[in-house]
Curated annotation (Swiss-Prot):
InterPro entries: PSII_PsbL, PSII_PsbL_sf. This is Photosystem II reaction center protein L. Its main location: plastid. One of the components of the core complex of photosystem II (PSII). PSII is a light-driven water:plastoquinone oxidoreductase that uses light energy to abstract electrons from H(2)O, generating O(2) and a proton gradient subsequently used for ATP formation. It consists of a core antenna complex that captures photons, and an electron transfer chain that converts photonic excitation into a charge separation. This subunit is found at the monomer-monomer interface and is required for correct PSII assembly and/or dimerization. It is found in: Plastid, Chloroplast thylakoid membrane. PSII is composed of 1 copy each of membrane proteins PsbA, PsbB, PsbC, PsbD, PsbE, PsbF, PsbH, PsbI, PsbJ, PsbK, PsbL, PsbM, PsbT, PsbX, PsbY, PsbZ, Psb30/Ycf12, at least 3 peripheral proteins of the oxygen-evolving complex and a large number of cofactors. It forms dimeric complexes. The keyword Iron does not apply. GO terms for biological process: photosynthesis. It is a single-pass membrane protein.
Length: 38
């Protein structure tokens, strides 16, 4: 009964890392588009 807890933590960590990755790509896309249009 103690094993599901670390698994939940790893899943939450993967979700947060995925969100940070999408946010980073979004920011880079904005910077790249602003660099092109300027």
């Amino acid at each position: 009964m103690t094993k599901p807890n670390p698994n939940k933590q790893t899943v939450e960590l993967n979700r947060t890392s995925l969100y940070w990755g999408l946010l980073l790509i979004f920011v880079l896309a904005i910077l790249f588009s602003s660099y092109i249009f300027n």
